Swiss-Prot record:
Residues spanned by motif LXXLL motif 11: 585-589
Species whose genome carries this gene: Mus musculus
Motif (LXXLL motif 8): 365-369
Protein name: Proline-, glutamic acid- and leucine-rich protein 1
Motif (LXXLL motif 4): 155-159
Length: 1123
């Protein structure tokens, strides 16, 4: 066609030079090219009488192609400009010439449409009135409908451009528009749609000038409201909705706002009247309109064959559309919407159900019309929500009840159809879900959808029903329907056998006629509405609802990806798959506070969703992955994080002052040179706690004896959010060791502790910690330390604690377990020659897992705080909840310790009551005084003789300090300087131990307690007496700071919450390497030797730490073994 345009220009154009060889060289210039094209179009349409050669293509044959040529010309840009005025002038003359002839009017209108859109302002103002007169002449002529349609389209563009120019606006309004409307009103019936298009343009761009003909226009519009042509009816409704804005500010004595409200009330009154006529004697309690509106006088149908109910329904539909358009269209002045009256009409329509209709007479016809009336009411409700927005919130309860009511009314017969068939009433249900999405989109979480109540449960049930794919089912049926399987009374006959139902459900899907995309519209609408509701109201929705959605969505996504439900399900449609992924993302972004989101499963689903055939679905999955990645791995740390991240290793700075509502800031410890990087075990669990260090990839190395961070607990992890740690519990010179793997030294300052070279701690072997984690939070969650010296060590993590990190490298006993009220003890002075070692960076705090049930005799004392100076405390630890170490394989020893604790409880009771109030004051006063010191110890391995001498010396010094306390040493042993009263013994049930010969289960919980002001005295230590026969079975638990988990536990046989007295000296006990069990036994043999001197101390302090119920039989105290 382009070649024909160019050839026509060179053949017939007077200015043929541009078409020659010289003109083609200038095609690169934009204005020159447009001028060439304009002249080519002119040449095609000009007569060829003067040409010596007969034209190959007569002009009349270009008429069908002329609209396409105009569109092609517009692709090259605007034709306006000073350089094209001559060509445009030629086109104007050509257009006027063609409009004057009946045979060439269509070509003239095509050129006029190009001139109106492309001419500059000056040219448009000069020729606009003449063009309007030409169009009016075309409308008055009885031309073909196609010419009339093109003339109205050109008129719409001309009025739109003329309304922007004040001079033309006044001229056309005063002199031309009334005549133009009269011409449109007089068009033939077959041109009514074109006439309505022209009237709509007039009332839209020149509403004031149409006021004089408002009455005639209203009658014309009303007469077309019940038209059977949907396009004609829609145009009539759009025009009628603009009637209140016609005329001046006081149209017929009424303001525009008053006119709008009066028209609205008239529509409401007429709709109530039509509804009464449609369903007379079927409504249980008909509601009459009480508004000020006057019923419209609608003309009766001239067709006597049309049923009156069908005519009434068509009028009702037209008036309802007019009401909705008045609500949704823009109006030039603020108006008052009678919300209550509109809602009354909507409720009256939706209140009519099939149960109220009598099926005799015209009842079936009324039942046939009812769904369409409900659809009109739902459209009206949607327009009302759009018009009023969140101001409808006070009617939110009514709207929340209406939606499930409509779904219940149109849910019959939906479960009896085979897959591949469209379920009945899907259009109504789709509209209900669209209104649900709109209502939540407008009002947000205030909409109150799915937030409990009978209506919320009913709505959720319908949503899940429409989202779930259909399933094939076979059912047995009896041939005669008898309950006895065919054995009926009367004449004897052969027994009848049950047969399968021979319905369509029996046929396999491949042999069944059906629609592969059946019910996809209602499914996609339900998914959109549910996704929007979860996204906006997710945290307010019940936990059970979230779990139900998880149980449905996750398997459904997997089935869709594996192609298991794509036979005749709605998920063959890409819209439904997109809605399913959108719902899954909403469940991630707005989870319930009590139901963790399925993050791991969703990440896998989105990853697989990127391979979808549909580009829209795969693009959404890619965007969802980016969103999830931004949530799980933010590129920058958040401003207020619940737990500290792991920055680059750095020395331990002094701790910050604690806050009352959050844990102290995280202080990154130093580098970790001894242990290699910890391998990662896989993605995060979906619903369980965050994996600990053992299951996360580490960028650095873990040292053999790292110090805990400022807010670390005995697991080497920082305290969970909103837990304030007193300063005495933070690492300092008085309550922190550099090694963190040895016991605290309770000797006076000046006694250097023994040291152990880092390479000898593990016998030159680099340990690699490993953990086994469960992905779900269950009551039986355990962490198994695979690197410990014995394979039977299992650590149960109770509620409120994060998972266990790698344990310290030195095999020292665990911190003592408190059983009484918080006890304070003076801090241990720092060693002069102690050497600071870099500490390990702590991992972020994981969420606390639930408490697992103990499988042995468990005695849980009340949650207490542990004193910092107790043996095995390993320096200060962060606050945790019940510190209790339980060995389920030594029930006899537990009974002995309980008896001893009960004996000493009475001795210490009086003194505890006197110092109860002092402890509370000192607890807060000592917070700022005891965070300035830090102890660091190193042990040397292989020098057992040196250790014996140092143990004796340090134990002597501790004994002098403990027995030298003024007036506080009682017969049973020295109590701490300030002791609050012990709690009464709690009768905790004992569980019978399991018949497990080897594995020992340790329930380890820790809650550090307050300390006294720093001083030369140290807290008396409490340790149970350990029989010599139990020495070799003793399990050494590393001190709580950090380190690999292989040194945490060995064969746990220690009594609950008590430690051996021999380890009191801190660095006196050397952990043997895993390769030398003989040295380990020798080291353990020397542990109970110093207990002979400290037996009385142990007895004195038992009641202050553990309250256990007394037992009937009390075995004699065990004798101390000789070293």
């Amino acid at each position: 066609m382009a070649a024909a345009v160019l050839s026509g220009a060179s053949a017939g154009s007077p200015a043929g030079a541009p078409g020659g060889p010289g003109g083609l060289s200038a095609v690169g210039s934009g204005p020159r090219l447009r001028l060439l094209l304009l002249e080519s179009i002119s040449g095609l349409l000009q007569p060829r009488t003067a040409s010596p050669v007969a034209p190959v293509h007569p002009p009349i044959q270009w008429a069908p192609h002329l609209p396409g040529l105009m569109c092609l010309l517009r692709l090259h840009g605007t034709a306006g400009g000073a350089q094209n005025l001559s060509a445009l002038g030629a086109l104007v003359n050509l257009s006027n010439a063609h409009l004057g002839s009946i045979k060439t009017r269509f070509e003239g209108l095509c050129l006029l449409s190009l001139l109106i859109g492309e001419s500059p302002t000056e040219l448009f103002q000069q020729h606009c009135v003449s063009w309007l007169r030409s169009i009016q002449q075309v409308l008055q002529s009885q031309d073909s409908p196609s010419t009339m349609e093109l003339a109205v389209a050109v008129l719409r563009d001309l009025l739109r451009h003329a309304s922007q120019l004040p001079t033309l606006f006044r001229d056309i309004s005063t002199n031309h528009l009334p005549g133009l409307l009269t011409s449109l009103l007089g068009l033939r019936p077959e041109c009514e749609q074109s006439a309505l298009e022209g009237m709509k343009a007039c009332v839209t761009y020149f509403p004031r000038a149409c006021g004089s003909l408002k009455g005639k226009l209203a009658s014309f519009f009303l007469s077309r409201l019940d038209s059977l042509n949907p396009q004609l009816q829609q145009l009539a409704c759009e025009c009628y909705s603009r009637l209140p804005s016609l005329g001046a500010g006081f149209s017929q004595g009424l303001k525009h706002t008053e006119n709008w409200e009066q028209e609205l009330h008239s529509l409401l009154t007429s709709l109530h009247s039509l509804l009464g006529s449609l369903f007379e004697e079927t409504e249980p309690a008909p509601v009459q309109s009480e508004g000020p509106g006057i019923e419209m006088l609608l003309s009766h149908s001239e067709d006597g064959n049309t049923h009156v109910l069908l005519q009434l329904r068509q009028r009702f539909s037209g008036l309802a559309r007019c009401l909705g358009l008045m609500l949704s269209s823009e109006f030039g002045a603020p108006v008052s919407v009678p919300v209550q009256e509109i809602l009354d009409l909507i409720c009256r329509i939706l209140g009519i159900s099939s149960k109220n209709i009598n099926l005799l007479g015209d009842g079936p016809l009324r039942l046939l019309l009812l769904p369409s009336l409900h659809l009109e009411a739902l459209d009206l409700l949607s327009a009302l929500i759009l018009a009023c927005g969140s101001r409808l919130l006070r009617f939110g309860a009514l709207i929340s009840r209406l939606l499930p009511q409509v779904l219940n009314a149109w849910s019959t017969g939906r479960d009896t159809l085979a897959p591949g068939q469209e379920r009945p009433y899907s259009t109504i249900r789709t509209k209900v879900y669209a209104i649900l999405e709109l209502w939540v989109q407008v009002c947000g979480a205030s909409a109150g959808m799915l937030q409990g109540g009978a209506s919320g449960e009913a709505l959720l049930t319908h949503l899940l029903s429409d989202i779930s794919p259909p399933a094939d089912a076979l059912k047995l049926c009896s041939t005669r329907g008898s309950s006895d399987g065919g054995l009926q009374s009367g004449k004897p006959s052969a027994p009848k056998k049950l047969k399968l139902d021979m319905g369509e459900a029996l046929a396999p899907p491949s042999q069944r006629k059906g629609d592969r995309n059946a019910n996809s519209d209602v499914c996609a609408a339900a998914l959109r509405g549910l996704s929007r509701t979860i996204l906006m109201c997710g945290p307010l929705i019940k936990e059970e609802t979230h779990r139900r959605l998880h149980d449905l969505v996750l398997p459904l996504v997997m089935s869709v990806q594996q192609g298991e439900v794509l036979g005749s399900s709605p998920y063959n449609s890409s819209c439904c798959r997109l809605g399913l992924y959108r719902l899954l993302l909403a469940l991630l972004l707005a989870p319930s506070p009590r139901c963790p989101p399925p993050l791991a499963c969703a990440l896998k689903a989105f990853s697989l969703g990127q391979w979808e055939d549909s580009l829209e679905v795969s693009s959404f999955c890619s965007e969802a992955l980016v969103t999830c990645a931004a949530l799980t791995h933010p590129r920058v740390p958040p401003l207020q994080s619940s737990g500290p991240a792991c920055p680059t290793p750095a020395p331990v700075p002094p701790p910050e002052a604690p806050s009352s509502f959050r844990a102290p800031a995280f202080h990154p410890p130093g580098p970790m040179p001894s242990i290699g990087a910890v391998p990662s075990t896989g993605p995060l669990p979906s619903a369980g706690p965050i994996p600990t260090v053992g299951s996360m990839a580490s960028t650095g190395q873990v040292p053999s004896r790292p110090g805990p961070p400022a807010t670390a607990n005995h697991l080497g992890l920082s305290v969970p959010g909103l837990v304030s740690v007193p300063p005495r519990l933070l690492p300092g010179p008085e309550n922190h060791r550099a090694g963190s793997g040895e016991d605290p030294v309770l000797a006076p300052s000046g006694t250097p502790p023994p040291s152990i070279p880092p390479d000898e701690t593990f016998g030159g072997r680099v340990p690699r910690p490993a953990f086994v984690h469960y992905d779900k939070e269950e009551a039986s969650d355990v962490e198994i330390s695979l690197e410990s010296d014995s394979d039977d060590s299992v650590v149960i993590v109770p509620e409120g604690l994060p998972s266990l990190p790698p344990a310290p490298p030195s095999g020292t006993p665990p911190p003592a377990a408190p059983a009484g009220p918080p006890t304070a003890s003076p801090p241990v002075p720092a060693k002069e020659d102690s050497e600071e070692l870099p500490a390990t960076p702590g991992p972020p705090p994981p969420p606390p897992p639930p408490p697992p049930p103990a499988s042995g005799p468990v005695t849980l004392p009340p949650p207490q705080l542990v004193p910092e100076g107790t043996p095995g405390g390993g320096g200060p630890t962060a606050m945790e909840e019940d510190l209790t170490v339980i060995n389920i394989n030594s029930s006899d020893e537990e009974e002995e310790e309980e008896e001893e604790e009960e004996e000493e409880d009475e001795d210490e009771e009086e003194e505890d009551f006197e110092e109860e109030e002092e402890d509370e004051e000192e607890y807060f006063e000592e917070e700022e005084e005891e965070e300035e010191f830090e102890e660091e110890f190193e042990e040397e391995e292989g020098e057992l003789e040196e250790e014996e001498e140092e143990e004796e010396e340090e134990l002597d010094e501790v004994e002098d300090v403990e027995f030298g306390s003024a007036g506080e040493v009682e017969e049973g042993g020295p109590p701490p300087p300030t002791l609050p009263p012990a709690l009464p013994p709690s009768d905790s049930p004992k569980v019978q131990p399991e018949a497990e010969p080897e594995p020992g289960l340790l329930l380890e919980v820790e809650e550090p307690g307050p300390e006294e002001v720093p001083g030369p005295e140290t807290a008396p230590t409490l340790a149970p007496e350990v029989l010599p026969s139990q020495e070799e079975g003793e399990q050494e638990v590393g001190s709580p700071a950090a380190g690999p988990p292989q040194e945490l536990v060995e064969e746990s046989s220690a009594p609950p919450a008590l430690l051996e007295e021999g380890t009191e000296g801190g660095g006196d006990k050397v952990p043997p390497p895993p390769e030398t069990p003989a040295e380990e036994m020798e080291t353990e043999a020397e542990v109970p030797a110093p207990q002979e001197k400290e037996q009385d101390d142990t007895a004195a302090m038992l009641a202050d730490f553990i309250d256990c119920p007394p037992d009937d039989e009390k075995p004699p105290p065990a004798t101390e073994p000789d070293s």
